């Protein structure tokens, strides 16, 4: 084997150096799995275990079961959905709802905002004037309507999507009407 090939083979056998810009480093694959994540998702509507000292992870609060029924310990292990559903007959409806909300599939979902009729009227009036309000208008609306600014931003996004959908449907109906009248002639 030539000297240059031997050097290449030796380089391939050597342990790769750790670069700050390697794929493993960027993706965090070179770290322990027990490391605390640098960023936690912002979910103010979810309860955290601040008192348990478990890095602020979401807790699963399970009520005491009726006598004679034993459950696996849930203090150290999160309860999977299948296991929780197996025991759902032993809990009241409100306890089951609370349990469902605390399961992992529900953690990331924010509760739906129920707008009052007054709030909807004000938002619709503003939408008629400006369907793309700036941050200053949204913040004023949030203060006046006692809502969060991000809820107002989402409302306007949804309202624009509704307008676009209705416009598309009306265009389709007009085209369909024209097509039908042309066929009858």
From Swiss-Prot:
InterPro entries attached to this UniProt entry: HD, Hesx1, Homeobox_CS, Homeodomain-like_sf
Main location: nucleus
Keyword Iron-sulfur belongs to the record: no
Annotated compartments: Nucleus
Assigned keywords, A-Z: Developmental protein, DNA-binding, Homeobox, Nucleus, Transcription, Transcription regulation
MF terms in GO: chromatin binding; DNA binding; DNA-binding transcription repressor activity, RNA polymerase II-specific; protein homodimerization activity; RNA polymerase II cis-regulatory region sequence-specific DNA binding
GO biological process entries: camera-type eye development; canonical Wnt signaling pathway; cellular response to cadmium ion; ERK1 and ERK2 cascade; forebrain morphogenesis; gene expression; gonad development; leukemia inhibitory factor signaling pathway
Gene3D superfamilies xrefs: Homeodomain-like (1.10.10.60)
Gene Ontology CC annotations of this record: nucleus
SMART domains recorded: HOX
Family: Belongs to the ANF homeobox family.
Function text: Required for the normal development of the forebrain, eyes and other anterior structures such as the olfactory placodes and pituitary gland. Possible transcriptional repressor. Binds to the palindromic PIII sequence, 5'-AGCTTGAGTCTAATTGAATTAACTGTAC-3'. HESX1 and PROP1 bind as heterodimers on this palindromic site, and, in vitro, HESX1 can antagonize PROP1 activation.
PANTHER family linked to this entry: HOMEOBOX EXPRESSED IN ES CELLS 1 (PTHR46966:SF1)
Subunit-structure text: Can form heterodimers with PROP1 in binding to DNA. Interacts with TLE1.
Name of the molecule in the record: Homeobox expressed in ES cells 1
Species the sequence originates in: Pan troglodytes (Chimpanzee)
């Amino acid at each position: 084997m030539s000297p240059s090939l031997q050097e290449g083979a030796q380089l391939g056998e050597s342990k790769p150096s750790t670069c700050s810009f390697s794929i493993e480093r960027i993706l965090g694959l070179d770290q322990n799995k027990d490391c605390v994540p640098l960023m936690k998702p912002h979910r103010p509507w979810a309860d955290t275990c601040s008192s348990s000292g478990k890095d602020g992870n979401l807790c699963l609060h399970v009520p005491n079961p009726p006598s004679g029924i034993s459950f696996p310990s849930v203090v150290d292990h999160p309860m999977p959905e299948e296991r929780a559903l197996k025991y759902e007959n032993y809990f009241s409806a409100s306890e089951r709802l609370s349990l469902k909300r605390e399961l992992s599939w529900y953690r990331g979902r924010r509760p739906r905002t129920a707008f009052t009729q007054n709030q909807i009227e004000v938002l619709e009036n503003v939408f008629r004037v400006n369907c793309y309000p700036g941050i200053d208008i949204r913040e004023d609306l949030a203060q006046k309507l006692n809502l969060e600014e991000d809820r107002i931003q989402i409302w306007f996004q949804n309202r624009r999507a509704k307008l676009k959908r209705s416009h598309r449907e009306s265009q389709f109906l007009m085209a369909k009407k024209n097509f039908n009248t042309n066929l009858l002639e």
